[in-house]
Amino acid sequence: MSQPKRGRSSQAQNHLITILLALVIAGLSMWFGAGRDGGNAPDAAATPVPGSGLTVTYLDVGQGDCTLLQCDGQTMLIDAGIGEQANHITTYLKQQGVKSIDYLVCTHAHADHCGGMKAVIAAFPVHTLYSSVTSSSNGAFQRVMRAAETANLTITVPGVGNTFALGGATVTVLGPQKHYSDVNDQSLILRVDYGSNAFLFTGDAEYQSETDVLDAGENVRCDVIKAGHHGSRTSTGYRLLYEAQPKYAVISCGAGNEYGHPHDDTLSRLRDADVTVYRTDLNGTVVCRSDGTNLSFTTEKEG
C-alpha cells in the first residue's frame, strides 16, 4: 500500500512544479514583452519619435507677403512685407521665440515683399540670405543690399534643383527656370517637404514662370499652396492647380486693396479645384501646423 501513496504524492508534486514553472514563464514573458515602463515594446520601437513638427505662419502684413517657417529649432522667413510692416514683423518673430533666422528669402525685388527686410536683418542674426537677384534698381531692395553689406551677409541666388534642410524639413528650389524681364516671373519658387506633407511658395510668379516650371517636370505636388501674386488672376493657373493638387490655399492680401486682390477669376479656379481657401484680409494671420502626416489650421479671426 505504501508504493501507491508514494506515486500519488509524486504526481501531485510534479503537477505543482508544472504550474509554478508556467507561472514563472508567463511572468517573465510579460516583463520582457511589456518593458519596464509598462509600454508595448514592439509597437514603441516601430513608432518613430516625432520632432517638434513644422509650423508655417502666413503673417497678415496687409498688401504684401511674409511667411515664417519653424521646424525643429530652425527658422526660415520668406519675404518681409512693406517697410511700414517691419515693426509688426520683428515683434511677432520675437513673440514666437525667434532668436536668429537660418534662412531669409527674398522671392523678388518688390517693396511689398522685401520692404521689411532691412529691419529684420538689423533685429536678428541671419545665417543665409537667398534672393532671386543680387542687385536691383528697386529702392526697397537696395536697402536690403546695404543692410546685408552692413551685416556682412552675402546675397545668394540659389539654383534650380538646390535643396537645403530646415530642421526635419527639406526645401527645394523649383524656379525661376530662366531669367525673366518681368520681376514677378523672376520670383523664387520653393517646395517645402515635411514627412508626407508639402507646401508650395511661388512669390508673385505668373503664368509664364508657372508654365516653365511645369514644362521642366518639376514636382509641384503639395498639400498647401500659397496663391501667387496675392491672388491675382495672372497667377495660380488651372494647369498649376491640376499638377499641384493642393487641398488648401492661402492668399496674402490687404483688406480693400486697390488692386482688387484676390481676383474673382482666381477664386473661381480654386473653387473648381475644390481647394479650401484662407485669406489674410479676412482671416488675419493664418497658422498651419504639420506633424509630417496631418495638418491643422488656426486663424487670427473668423473669415
Regions picked out by a protein language model, each given a short descriptive name:
Residues S2-G303:
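Non-globular, low-confidence helical/coil segments that flank catalytic cores
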